[in-house]
Amino acid sequence: MTTKTKSWSSAPLPFQGQKRNFASAYREVLKLYQECTTIVDLFGGSGLLARISKDERPDARVIFNDFDNFADRVRNIPNTNRLLHALREVVAGLKRHSLIPKEKKEAIISILEKETGFVDFVSISSSLLFSMKYETSLEGLKKQTFYNNVRLNDYSPADGYLDGIEVVKGDSKEIFERFKNEKNVLGSLTLRI
């Protein structure tokens, strides 16, 4: 008996510029390029187009340009969830979406400063900043006003999200150059290479 893998329509973590709004349209476009044996997600981001490509075309070689280190963020979901638990304790009793008082902000910063491993500041900042604002570092986060937007639930494990996908990291122009002369290659956003 084969196990059905999850079909992704959105990335497992927040990402500015996520392409989830046209996931179904992208699936339809992929059907038009059945002759393409290699699909390159040049602009990477959350890897959603690469994931959809592999789900729709399991026979194809799919390459994801992880320029934004999304794979590291996915691998660290358990750590992010652990930090979110700590943040929930700090903001307990505060009204949702309200301004976080200075002493609570300092407690949150103290928690983050004590972290010695990888911290997904994009996911953490999405729980602390005004809607659709993100920071990528502790220094950037410290400068912001905090709001109690802390997630009420953990992020779901993203097991298998990048399975079967070749992860590379580089300038999209360099990756384009690497594949432009190969036959049957489809670049992200259906730009035929």
Question: What is each of the regions a protein language model found here?
Answer:
Residues 1-38, 48, 55-56, 123, ...:
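S-adenosyl-L-methionine
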Residues 21, 37, 44, 48, ...:
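Short, well-structured alpha-helical interface segments that form or flank functional binding sites
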Residues 27, 40-53, 64-68, 127, ...:
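Conserved proline-anchored active-site loop of SAM-dependent methyltransferases
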Residues 28-32, 52-53, 155-158, 175-178:
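Short, flexible, glycine/charge-rich loop motifs used to bind or transfer phosphoryl groups or to couple energy/partner
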Residues 35-37, 59, 182-184:
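A general structural motif
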Residues 49-55, 73-77, 179:
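A short acidic (Asp/Glu
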Residues 61-166:
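Class I S-adenosyl-L-methionine-dependent methyltransferase module
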Residues 163-193:
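Conserved mid-sequence domains
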